[in-house]
Amino acid sequence: MALWILQNSSMYDYLVVGAGLYGAVFANQAKAQGKSVLVIDKRPNIAGNVFTEKIEGINVHKYGAHIFHTNNKKVWNFVNRFAEFNRFTNSPVANYKGELFSLPFNMYTFNKMWGVVTPSEAQAKIEEQKKQAGITEPKNLEEQAISLVGTDIYEKLIKGYTMKQWGRPCDKLPSFIIKRLPVRLTFDNNYFNALYQGIPVGGYTKMVENMLEGIDVKLGVDYFDNKSEYDAMASKVVYTGAIDAYFDYKLGTLEYRSVRFENEILDIPNFQGNAAVNYTDSE
């Protein structure tokens, strides 16, 4: 097996705390440079938040779906050394109380929402609603969203979903959060505007395992339980965990927003007809 558990302790060039993508890539590249590396992780598995597990023949992304995408050919060639990638293209669907809309926001979305058929008609509708809302300089997420896509789309496809996601009203969130959201005046529902995208065939866990081949890995241990002992095992430490924990919460705890995953196995061939469906009402 490529991945094995450390049996004895010795001096390493690097201690890598965290066996996720960053830790695995760093360890792989350090080993390629002739460095000795020990990777530790408090979880019982490698791959961090991209950990995948096969259930009923399906590669389940245990911490939420992850689609690899990049414009960098060097990066794409690198990850393809460790896994074959499929041709998955992320084209989400928004479900608002049974109404289905195309994501990211594009001409399919605008056509369904307003019946417009040309980019100029869509842009005019957005400008009309932006003017009606009296927004000139967006001060929060709500105003920024209306400036980008108008009031109707904000109310149906952004407001409730964002409140569920962040646990706060949209007018209490900063505007920059939504600025990266793709908005297109074309009939293009490919979420990522990247040259290369896909998901590793066999799952991310196998890809990370291949990256860590021949590298000492110790799982199920908390770095902070024996920090001084682990620090003494290597010349340098590469820490990939929570930054507030690393500094022992001396400046307080960072305000993380997380989700709860509920898994259910259904005896049907296809549940929702699309890999990603956003349920955008507030419930």
Language model features with spans:
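N-terminal Rossmann-like FAD-binding beta1-loop-alpha1 element of flavoenzymes
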Residues: 14-39
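Short His-Asn-centered micro-motif
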Residues: 17-19, 40-42, 70-71, 202, ...
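Glycine-rich FAD pyrophosphate-binding loop
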Residues: 31-55
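Mid-domain catalytic core of redox enzymes
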Residues: 33, 222-283
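Conserved beta-strand segments of alpha/beta enzyme cores
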Residues: 36, 59, 84, 216-218
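Dinucleotide-binding Rossmann-like beta1-alpha1 core, especially the glycine-rich loop
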Residues: 56-131
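Active-site/ligand-binding neighborhood in enzyme catalytic cores
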Residues: 97-101, 108-236, 240, 245-247
